[in-house]
From Swiss-Prot:
One of its GO terms (cellular component) is 90S preribosome. PANTHER family: PROTEIN KRI1 HOMOLOG (PTHR14490:SF5), ZINC FINGER, ZZ TYPE (PTHR14490). GO terms for biological process: definitive hemopoiesis; endonucleolytic cleavage in ITS1 to separate SSU-rRNA from 5.8S rRNA and LSU-rRNA from tricistronic rRNA transcript (SSU-rRNA, 5.8S rRNA, LSU-rRNA); ribosome biogenesis. Belongs to the KRI1 family. Residues 387-409, 441-451 have a biased composition (Acidic residues). InterPro entries: Kri1 (IPR018034), Kri1-like_C (IPR024626). Residues 20-32, 101-123, 149-162, 181-191, 305-334, 424-436, 466-478, 624-633, 683-697 have a biased composition (Basic and acidic residues). Residues 85-100 have a biased composition (Polar residues). Residues 20-56, 82-192, 292-334, 387-484, 603-648, 662-711, 746-765 are annotated as: Disordered. The gene is kri1. This is Protein KRI1 homolog.
Length: 765
């Protein structure tokens, strides 16, 4: 068959026919597009001329308005210019951000119409794309290499620099140019400027903003008039610009202007438009965006937010006032502390005079520092301890030269001279000095015959020196010097006037306590607050220092938790814990269970020593049977009888548990079987160890058992909570009947003892 051929002429004619048909159909539907474009362009030009604004012109307007509101003297100057010349020319060069150009969106039909009108309905085919790719490849092959391009760029840069230098020399050219701001940056600056006028942001103070500061303060005044506030909102929000009403309800003619085609796309678009129209019409009286949650108040009084920081300023004033009051209180407490310190120093001086110790242990440093209870106790113990009060109390002081006082006077009962006696002694001394005549019995009497008494009397200093020299001489020379002096040093000290003891006066310790109480950490509600120390009962928790140091942390926590040692409790609770831990410390078995590491070391050493004296298995079984028989015999005895020595450890455990559980109910007597078994195993192991230590254990003697002993054991009952239970029944539940029996026995004894004590108390009353 021959190849198929296409008639190209017929194809071209048919294609032209289809294009004309499509063009006519579009014209019938949309009308003449050229006329509409011309009319629309004229309308848009008129709208743009109305909307276009200049931001510099707005700033000049705000500046002049601020000067007018302020009544600045610049207004009355003849040469004052409120609008710069640049604003007139800048409006044509730069388009403001606020101007909105009405640009019609392009749809698919518009694009097809454009292709039909401009290109005759021809689209770019694959052949043309291949041709473009081949052309690009040819251009790339003819282009220079990378090195050649770099050289060309360097040469062009050199030429440009040389030309720019020549132009700079002439004064016309400029190598560096000012960077032009983008439209986004300009819009952002304009928005910041408007927000600054609204009072919502702060900007750097520039010369341009100084003149407009008054206008900003005027508009942000909360007491602004309604008319002025309306003018402010109208100017700042640019209410004079007409905005497109997006939610405008279209008319019926606008909706039905386009004919509905049979195609699915146009039918769907018509349905969407119909639904939108119905929705807008039905909800025309409701608020827009009613389904969204508003993050701002619905009814805004003014669009410009005014700062209302009255509460903040009030809080700051209150805070400052409280800080000042706190400082005044601290200053007053410091002054009080200084006065108290001066009072204590006066007391110290008096103590130095009375005690004769001029170097006491207290200094200014001790009083200036912070209060330390341990240091305070050490100082008080050092100065006023047992040594201070016990000093010179072992023997009564004796003076050799005071015979006249020792014979007839008891100085221990001396209270002090009264006022009349002191005046009499003073007068007597004064008269004696006036009518003094030398006597041979006086110690200062001169035996020289050539001595002239009319000469000047000896000075007091010389007399003191002579007395000191006489004291230095030995006792053998004393009788040769004549009679002793009348008054000794002790008598002079006693004769001095001293303050009588006042029981109402505070002690030195009380003064120090008051001084240290003036210290404080903080002042809360005009009250100085300080940390108070608290006395706590000393408690070792039933452990020695070696046990505490050698035991592990887990073992110590099992004995007594760390939380319990740090609890804040009353003195009564502390004493109860002290008593309980003392009882707990006596239980050696409990300690062995808790402190395993301590007792394992001792047991290991003893086992190494006693490895020779081990007992065989058969003998151990015999000893166990003998012990069991002894236990069964002792249980048949009366209830008042004491438990056998083999069960002393078990009884001690019961005592400890009963002492801690005195308030436990009688019904809570059931003990788990596992605990019973562990207690019995510990007792048996202990007995085995005692037996193993003996090299040749003696076989225990068999005691005469009563007939029917086992029957008696089985038939014996245990009373618990007012009921009787057989031993077999308790054993069936996994309980130890012996343990329960002794527990009830000790409870009865305790009750009887309490009754006897009550009766004794009543009898004493």
């Amino acid at each position: 068959m021959s190849d198929l051929k296409i008639n190209k002429k017929f194809a071209e004619k048919y294609e032209k026919y289809r294009q004309k048909e499509e063009l006519q159909r579009l014209k019938d539907r949309y009308g003449d597009q050229e006329e509409e474009n011309s009319s629309n362009s004229s309308e848009s030009d008129s709208d743009d001329s109305e909307v276009e604004l200049d931001p510099k012109l707005d700033r000049d307007f705000y500046r002049t308005l601020s000067l007018l509101k302020k009544k600045d003297p610049k207004i009355y100057q003849k040469d004052a210019k409120f609008y710069t010349e640049e604003t007139s020319g800048s409006g044509s060069d730069e388009q403001p951000s606020t101007s909105k150009q009405s640009e019609k969106p392009m749809f698919l039909k518009d694009y097809e119409r454009k292709v039909i009108l401009e290109r005759g309905g021809k689209y770019e085919d694959d052949d043309s794309a291949d041709e473009e790719i081949s052309a690009k490849m040819q251009e790339r092959a003819a282009s220079p290499t990378y090195i050649q391009e770099q050289k060309e760029i360097q040469e062009s840069l050199r030429k440009f620099v040389q030309d720019s230098d020549d132009e700079d020399s002439d004064g016309d050219g400029q190598f560096l140019t000012r960077r032009t701001k983008t439209q986004e940056e300009k819009d952002k600056e304009e928005a910041d400027y408007v927000e600054w006028l609204k009072g919502q942001t702060e900007l750097d103070e520039k010369e341009e903003l100084k003149d407009m500061k008054y206008l900003r303060d005027y508009w942000n005044n909360p007491q602004l008039d309604e008319k002025e506030s309306f003018l402010r909102d109208f100017m700042l929000n640019k209410g004079y610009m007409e905005e497109e009403d997006e939610e405008r309800i279209p008319t019926y003619n606008e909706l039905m202007q386009d004919d509905v085609d049979d195609s699915e796309d146009e039918g769907e678009s018509f349905l969407h438009k119909q639904e939108d129209f119905e929705r807008h019409y039905n909800f025309r009286f409701e608020e827009p965006d009613a389904g969204k949650v508003k993050t701002y108040p619905r009814n805004i009084a003014t669009s410009v937010r005014s700062k209302d920081d009255r509460r903040k300023r009030k809080r700051e004033e209150v805070k400052e006032r409280k800080e000042k009051e706190k400082e005044q209180k601290q200053q007053q407490l410091k002054e009080l502390k200084n006065l108290k310190r001066a009072e204590i120093m006066d007391k110290l001086k008096k103590l130095q005079e009375l005690t004769g110790n001029e170097q006491l242990a207290f200094n200014d440093v001790d009083l200036d520092g912070d209060f330390d209870p341990q240091q305070h106790d050490q100082l008080m113990q050092k100065v006023f301890g047992d040594e201070y009060y016990e000093e010179n109390e072992e023997e009564k002081p004796q003076f050799e030269g005071d015979e006249e006082f020792e014979e007839n006077w008891n100085w221990d009962t001396w209270v002090g001279k009264q006022q009349n006696e002191e005046e009499y002694d003073h007068k007597e001394d004064y008269t004696a000095e006036e009518h003094y005549q030398p006597n041979c019995d006086d110690p200062d009497f001169i035996m020289d015959a050539d001595y002239d008494p009319s000469q000047q009397a000896v000075s007091k200093k010389k007399r003191k020196k002579e007395r000191e020299e006489k004291k230095k001489k030995s006792k053998e020379d004393v009788p040769l010097m004549g009679k002793k002096r009348k008054k000794s040093h002790f008598a002079e000290i006693i004769s001095k006037s001293k303050p009588v003891f006042d029981p109402n006066e505070k002690s030195f310790e009380q003064y120090l306590d008051e001084y240290y109480k003036l210290d404080f950490e903080d002042i809360i509600d005009d009250l100085p607050c300080r940390f108070r120390y608290r006395e706590v009962v000393a408690n070792d928790f039933g452990l020695s220092t070696d046990e505490i140091l050698n035991a592990g942390d887990k073992e110590l926590n099992r004995w007594c938790s760390l939380r319990k040692t740090c609890m804040y409790r009353s003195e009564r609770e502390e004493l109860c814990d002290l008593k309980n831990f003392q009882i707990k410390a006596r239980n050696v078995k409990k300690k062995q269970q808790v402190f395993v590491s301590l007792f394992n070391e001792n047991d290991g050493q003893e086992e190494q020593k006693d490895t020779k004296g081990k007992v065989g298995k058969k003998r151990r079984d015999r000893l166990k049977k003998a012990e069991l028989t002894e236990k069964s015999d002792t249980t048949v005895t009366e209830e008042t009888a004491e438990p056998p020595p083999a069960e002393q450890a078990d009884v001690q455990d019961l005592k400890a548990t009963i002492a801690n559980d005195e308030e436990e109910d009688d019904e809570e007597f059931l003990v788990p079987k596992k605990k019973m078994k562990t207690a019995e195993t510990v007792v048996t192991k202990r007995k085995e160890a005692d037996v193993e230590r003996t090299e040749k254990p003696k076989r225990p003697r068999k005691k005469m058992r009563r007939s029917g002993g086992r029957r008696l054991l089985k038939s014996m009952t245990v009373k618990m909570a007012g009921r009787e239970f057989s031993r077999q029944r308790l054993q069936a539940y996994g309980l130890n009947p012996k343990r329960l029996h002794f527990r009830e026995l000790y409870r009865q004894k305790r009750k009887e003892r309490e009754k006897q004590e009550k009766q004794q108390k009543k009898s004493k009353q």
